[in-house]
Amino acid sequence: MQSTMKMFGIILMVIFSVSCGPSAPQMKTREVAERTHKCSLVRGTCKSECNSWEYKYNYCHTEPCCVVREYKRMEKLLSTPKYTT
């Protein structure tokens, strides 16, 4: 009777320890989904390689998240005072 209770206890411990928390593939899938979501938040796309006008933000799964570089005007040249004589 005691040996069957010990075996039952061991089996329950194994079942509970294995079933706790997400498995490794589920965590990997969740990380990939979060990275892809972050990529879409910065208006990027997950592609095999980035073009010259894009930069790598982070990696979605194995491919980079490519974000388009924005054109920024040079405010310094536009805001310089004009001198008149």
Curated annotation (Swiss-Prot):
Any one biological process term the GO annotation gives: innate immune response
Cited Pfam families: Defensin_beta_2 (PF13841)
First and last residue of the signal peptide: 1-23
Example of a GO cellular component annotation carried by this entry: extracellular region
Disulfide bonding pattern of the chain: 39-65, 46-60, 50-66
Superkingdom of the organism of origin: Eukaryota
Major place of residence: secreted
Keywords: Antibiotic, Antimicrobial, Defensin, Disulfide bond, Secreted, Signal
InterPro entries: Beta_defensin_dom
Protein's cellular compartments: Secreted
Described purpose of this protein according to its UniProt entry: Has antibacterial activity.
Family: Belongs to the beta-defensin family.
PANTHER family the UniProt entry points to: BETA-DEFENSIN 113 (PTHR39411:SF1)
Identification of the protein by name: Beta-defensin 18
Organism: Mus musculus (Mouse)
